[in-house]
Swiss-Prot record:
Purpose of the protein: NDH-1 shuttles electrons from an unknown electron donor, via FMN and iron-sulfur (Fe-S) centers, to quinones in the respiratory and/or the photosynthetic chain. The immediate electron acceptor for the enzyme in this species is believed to be plastoquinone. Couples the redox reaction to proton translocation, and thus conserves the redox energy in a proton gradient. Cyanobacterial NDH-1 also plays a role in inorganic carbon-concentration.
Main location: membrane
EC number: 7.1.1.-
Membrane topology: Peripheral membrane protein
Organism: Prochlorococcus marinus (strain MIT 9313)
Any single GO CC term annotated in Swiss-Prot or TrEMBL for this entry: plasma membrane-derived thylakoid membrane
Recorded family membership: Belongs to the complex I NdhM subunit family.
Name of the protein this chain belongs to: NAD(P)H-quinone oxidoreductase subunit M
Entries under Pfam families matching the protein: NdhM
Keywords for the protein's UniProt record, in alphabetical order: Membrane, NAD, NADP, Plastoquinone, Quinone, Thylakoid, Translocase, Transport
Length: 115
């Protein structure tokens, strides 16, 4: 019987109940895989990426033992979106000017001229 792949998709976060094998997603109810900013809207430093990964691990741990549902995955995804917004507002994360579509989905950049 095929396993069902649960997923959460937000603007900048995708979470799957799967593992990656040979660049393919293989359903796995015992593992969550995070795809961060698939459209490359932001410029990510290693430290900011680690901060998001750490927050993801904390959120997953806080839901350990609970039902693995679409709703809970969406809660984790929404929390990560909020973390991304905070990092952007704090100046730790910036928009990628080379992005395919520069739409400032999390608000206009905070620059001294705009404050």
């Amino acid at each position: 019987m095929n396993e069902t792949l649960l997923k959460c998709t937000t603007r900048h976060v995708r979470i799957f109940t799967a593992r990656v094998e040979n660049n393919d997603l293989v359903p796995d109810p015992n593992q969550l895989t995070l795809d961060l900013d698939p459209d490359n809207e932001f410029l990510w430093t290693e430290s900011v990426t680690k901060e998001i990964q750490q927050r993801f691990a904390e959120l997953v741990a806080s839901h350990a033992g609970g039902e693995l549902s679409d709703y809970n995955l969406r809660r984790i995804g929404s929390e990560l979106e909020g973390t991304i917004r905070k990092l952007l507002q704090a100046g730790k994360l910036s928009y990628n000017p080379e992005c395919r579509v520069l739409n400032y989905s999390m608000g206009l950049p905070r620059t001294p001229e705009l404050l």
